[in-house]
């Protein structure tokens, strides 16, 4: 007698960005499982999965972000605890879905006696029991090698490019620094647009403080769009935008995958030459981070397709024409 087992897909989410997880579940036609997350009186996080996951493929969705009542460290810890709970409940395969991967900028030792925290986070996920990692637009490609297992590196480029097409014909895609030139070039090629680069000089010993310096490329009288993986305090983007205006750009917009928007970011963008900020919803955007210039596009369809491909054991890279390995 041949025994045929049916594959089971289960979706779970932490509390950092529940609306995104609910949108993904809706697109997949699946019900979002209950993780029953709570804190003890001393702040320790506890989870009890609400249904049987034995033998199932469990996808645990959590953006590593700060929201009311949760720090970025809490959001990572929630995901680790849910992974451990699923492993101990005999899940067949556990996939950590991290639309925004925390500590990604700490991907190397910039100076002596510094940690490589992006690698530490990857090790924690593996130790907790994750078999696979899914993320979007990692800050650097080498993070894919930090996790001891398959990593599906998705890109928000299809979503952002669709939005950027509405900016006009004579478009210049601009990299805000030399490190993002390769990404900006990919956008420029798909948009059939020209490419420009803004050189920047960081102020020594001042974290999150930058000074834009010069522009390479023809921007005079043209519409420019700055592209980066994330905008944190917006110092880089605003300084680059002012530099482009000084070099004759007719208008300047910005686009990013991850709108971190920490501290002074919102006020800086509001009071800058940036006309529109095009971004995705990899991170939650509470009321205090919403403003007229902000234009948010959902990343849920890309995540849903990737989750379906992983579950069905089909190609994820084909979703991006094989161009998601950078």
Which role does the model predict for each range below?
Residues 1-326:
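PRPP-associated nucleotide enzymes
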């Amino acid at each position: 007698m041949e025994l045929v087992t049916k594959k089971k897909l289960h979706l779970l989410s932490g509390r950092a960005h529940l609306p995104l997880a609910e949108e993904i579940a809706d697109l997949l036609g699946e019900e979002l499982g209950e993780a029953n997350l709570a804190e003890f009186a001393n702040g320790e996080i506890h989870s009890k999965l609400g249904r049987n996951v034995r033998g199932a493929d469990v996808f645990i969705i959590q953006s590593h972000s700060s929201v009311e009542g949760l720090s970025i460290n809490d959001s990572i810890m929630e995901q680790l605890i849910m992974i451990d709970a699923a492993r101990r409940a005999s899940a067949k395969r556990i996939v950590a879905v991290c639309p925004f991967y925390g500590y990604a900028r700490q991907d190397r030792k910039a100076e002596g006696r510094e940690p490589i925290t992006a690698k530490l986070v990857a090790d924690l996920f593996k130790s907790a029991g994750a078999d696979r990692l899914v993320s979007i637009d990692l800050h650097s490609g080498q993070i894919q090698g930090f996790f001891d297992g398959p990593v599906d590196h998705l890109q928000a480029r299809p979503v952002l490019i669709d939005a950027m097409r509405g900016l006009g014909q004579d478009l210049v895609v601009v990299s805000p620094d030399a490190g993002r030139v390769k990404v900006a070039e990919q956008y420029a090629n798909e948009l059939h647009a020209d490419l420009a680069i803004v050189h920047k000089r960081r102020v020594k010993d001042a974290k999150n403080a930058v000074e834009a310096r010069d522009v390479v490329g023809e921007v005079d009288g043209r519409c420019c769009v700055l592209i980066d993986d994330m905008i944190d305090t917006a110092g880089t983007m605003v300084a680059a935008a002012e530099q482009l205006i000084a070099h004759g750009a007719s208008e300047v917009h910005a686009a990013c995958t991850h709108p971190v928007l920490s501290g002074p970011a919102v006020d800086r963008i509001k009071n800058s030459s940036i006309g529109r900020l095009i971004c995705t919803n990899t991170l939650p955007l509470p009321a205090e981070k919403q403003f007229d210039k902000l234009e948010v596009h959902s990343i849920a369809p890309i995540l849903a397709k990737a989750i379906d491909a992983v579950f069905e054991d089909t190609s994820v890279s084909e979703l991006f024409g094989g161009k998601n390995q950078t």
